[in-house]
Swiss-Prot record:
The gene is wtf36. Pfam families: WTF (PF03303). Homomer. Forms protein aggregates. The two isoforms can interact with each other and with themselves. High sequence similarity is required for their interaction. Keywords: Cytoplasm, Endoplasmic reticulum, Membrane, Toxin, Transmembrane, Transmembrane helix, Vacuole. This is Meiotic driver wtf36. Residues 1-49, 67-99 are annotated as: Disordered. Residues 11-29 have a biased composition (Basic and acidic residues). It comes from the Eukaryota. It comes from Schizosaccharomyces pombe (Fission yeast). Promotes unequal transmission of alleles from the parental zygote to progeny spores by acting as poison/antidote system where the poison and antidote proteins are produced from the same locus; the poison component is trans-acting and targets all spores within an ascus whereas the antidote component is spore-specific, leading to poisoning of all progeny that do not inherit the allele. One of its GO terms (biological process) is meiotic drive. Belongs to the WTF family.
């Protein structure tokens, strides 16, 4: 029996950079392997039993799909995860001895041709739109067209030859642009969010500040008005007379300006008189009445305005009822009525503090008294009518007595 040296050849030889005749300097030369009795183990093997070689070959060569080199595909190297079945490794021999790489080349050529088509598509569309595509071409145009075709061909060859380079560049560029867009969108979203939050806080702070300013201003004005009113109330009544005289001067100035000037009586005179009377009466309420609440102040103001509004409404209603238009004289009468009513309310409130509060009751009592007076007048007229009727009956009785005969009168006299 001859011991022949057969180096263990497998598909793993293609992964290493060693040749068939290389010797590992650390472990020494390869021992001889007896294929008949199997007494000699494979080189550098850790197996004690040659029968375990088929079971543990996956551990020996670390067969794993995740660590399989890319040169080994599923057709050339069959990998199993079970340890009992050894991998079925074999080589595929082609008739030509080389792999078929025609499909990837065609794919590369097609992908490289795509940018050229996309680049030429706008030019072709423009020429079609102008109706100048291959039409009326001269020598210069055909020369330019041939040069352009040459450039496109060279570009196609260049793109096909450097396919991996420019595809990686395009891929990196697209990924970079996508990341830029993503980062930009996230940044803009954060900016919008921060801006909205900032504006909301600004609006909130501004509203709180304005509310505090309004509150402080209102308190300050209320204190000023209260101090002024208390000071005037504690002073003599001559201040009230001075205010009334000032009011009268303003109203008469308006009258004279409207009479001899160019003021519109309907707007300037009536509205100014109402506003002046309301404002001065409001001030009078602060001076004369012994309370300083807004409730009584506004009640007096609305009562005065209500009375003046009633006068204006009645006047307007009467003019429209009788189909009359108010001329300058009518406006003077209306303004005079408002002026008289305002003065009357002013003096009445000055002499009797709190009179405006009692005015509704006074008006109701006045209306009731007026109606009672009308009723009494009606009763008196009825009594006068009854008396007149009795007088008529008396006259009728006297006429009946004159119609009696003389004989009957003698008999009655004897009886």
């Amino acid at each position: 029996m001859k011991n022949k040296y057969y180096p263990l050849r497998s598909s793993m030889d293609e992964m290493s950079a060693k040749n068939d005749n290389e010797i590992d300097l650390e472990k020494g030369p390869l021992p001889e392997y007896n294929s008949e009795d199997g007494s000699t183990l494979p080189p550098y093997s850790d197996l004690n039993n040659p029968k375990q070689m088929g079971q543990n070959i996956t551990k020996l060569f670390n067969w794993n799909k995740s660590t399989t080199p890319p040169d080994y595909d599923e057709n050339r190297l069959h990998i199993t995860d079970e340890g009992n079945n050894p991998p079925n490794t074999h080589r595929e021999n082609h008739s030509s001895g080389t792999a078929d790489n025609s499909s990837p080349f065609l794919i590369k050529l097609l992908i490289s041709f795509t940018p050229i088509v996309l680049l030429n598509a706008p030019a072709v569309c423009y020429l079609k739109y102008k109706d100048a595509f291959f039409k009326n071409y001269g020598a210069a145009e055909w020369t330019l067209f041939g040069f352009w075709c040459l450039v496109c061909t060279l570009a196609l060859i260049f793109l096909t030859y450097f396919y991996e380079t420019w595809t990686k560049a395009v891929k990196v560029t697209v990924i970079f642009l996508a990341q830029c867009v993503k980062v930009t969108v996230i940044f803009l979203a954060k900016c919008v969010k921060v801006t909205v939050i900032f504006l909301a806080k600004c609006v909130k702070v501004t509203a709180i500040s304005l509310a505090k300013c309004i509150k402080v201003t209102a308190i300050f004005l209320a204190q000023c008005v209260k101090v002024t009113a208390v000071g005037l109330y504690n002073s003599r009544e001559k201040w009230v007379v001075i205010i009334w005289l000032l009011w009268v001067v303003i109203c008469y100035t308006l009258f004279l300006r409207s009479k001899f000037g160019n003021l519109n009586l309907n707007k300037a005179l009536i509205c100014s008189t109402c506003s002046i009377s309301a404002a001065l009466l409001l001030f009078l309420l602060y001076v004369r009445l012994p309370f300083w609440t807004l409730k009584h102040m506004f009640s007096g103001l609305f009562q005065v305005l209500g009375v003046q509004s009633c006068v204006v409404i009645v006047t307007k209603g009467l003019t429209y009822l009788f189909d009359k238009h108010i001329d300058a004289t009518g406006y003077e009468i209306e303004a005079s009525s408002l002026f008289v009513i305002g003065n009357f309310l002013f003096f009445y409130e000055m002499e009797c503090p709190g009179a405006l509060k009692r005015m509704p009751k006074f008006i109701r009592n006045g209306i009731a008294s007026f109606l009672e007076g009308i009723g009494n007048i009606g009763n008196a007229i009825g009594r006068i009518g009854n008396a007149i009727g009795r007088i008529g009956n008396a006259f009728r009785g006297a006429n009946d007595n004159n119609d009696i005969p003389l004989g009957e009168m003698e008999v009655e006299s004897e009886v």
